[in-house]
Amino acid sequence: MWNLRITPLSFGAACQGIFTSTLLLSALTVPLVCTIVYDSCLYMDINASRALANVYDLPDDFFPKIDDLVRDAKDALEPYWKSDSIKKHVLIATHFVDLIEDFWQTTQGMHEIAESLRAVIPPTTAPVPTGYLIQHEEAEEIPLGDLFKHQEERIVSFQPDYPITARIHAHLKAYAKINEESLDRARRLLWWHYNCLLWGEANVTNYISRLRTWLSTPEKYRGRDAPTIEAITRPIQVAQGGRKTSSGTRKPRGLEPRRRKVKTTFVYGRRRSKSRERRAPSPQRAGSPLPRSSSSHHRSPSPRK
């Protein structure tokens, strides 16, 4: 963290401030590479790519504060760090955790120094209008080494004899604003990647889609509460945990020959199996009664007798 000592002399403060701003500009501004849409080089699914782009449209108060976000991200990344995972979401989320931690405190320090410079700015000095300050979209097109020069030219075009201390204040406010917008995009991307590790990319994609639908629906036609990712993933977890596991082992198929099904037919009132061997035909004519034995000629005594 760097400190800018303010001296009572305007010239001393101005010279020291300009020297500090030009030398440390490359170390104080967030790398603009984090603001570029990079999902094309990550080989994302088309639905996940659209959901990631839609993260930028979500309201600012939807995301946690910087401190809470970094803490939650570290908790989610800790198991992957221990196993030295090289998953896509792990690598990118780790990059944004480091970037946000490094530049968030620096940006806050730039605001504090800019506010402290007000004491040495002449009270009659008018602030530089927003149109003369470099915006985030313009900073993406300007080389980092030329950023200070471009901003200085705009201040001179606004007022050629603008006080030097006020110029330093304008520079710091412009750079802090660029950093804040870059950190906001980095914060949204960090939220996306570490939630993909917690819930799965498909579930986060589905959640973003439902949330945007809920936000775009008029209030009187939508539910009172916004959808949550816990509610979306809960049915899947219940279905997986509710399956009953059988204690026995299932008999494998195809290892034993299938038993041939026995077909039976009825021939003149007698049941005969086709699979059995057929007996030799009887000399009796088919359908004639069987001859009785000699003992069967005697009539059995009547039960009345």
Swiss-Prot record:
Residues 226-305 are annotated as: Disordered. GO terms for cellular component: extracellular region. SUPFAM superfamilies: Hepatitis B viral capsid (hbcag). Residues 1-19 form the signal peptide. Its main location: secreted. It is found in: Secreted. Residues 258-277, 295-305 have a biased composition (Basic residues). Residues 273-305 form a propeptide. The record marks R272, S273 as: Cleavage. One of its GO terms (molecular function) is structural molecule activity. It comes from the Viruses. InterPro entries: Hepatitis_core, Viral_capsid_core_dom_sf_HBV. Keywords: Host-virus interaction, Secreted, Signal, Viral immunoevasion. Belongs to the avihepadnavirus precore antigen family. Homodimerizes. May regulate immune response to the intracellular capsid in acting as a T-cell tolerogen, by having an immunoregulatory effect which prevents destruction of infected cells by cytotoxic T-cells. This is External core antigen. The lineage of its organism: Viruses, Riboviria, Pararnavirae, Artverviricota, Revtraviricetes. The gene is C.
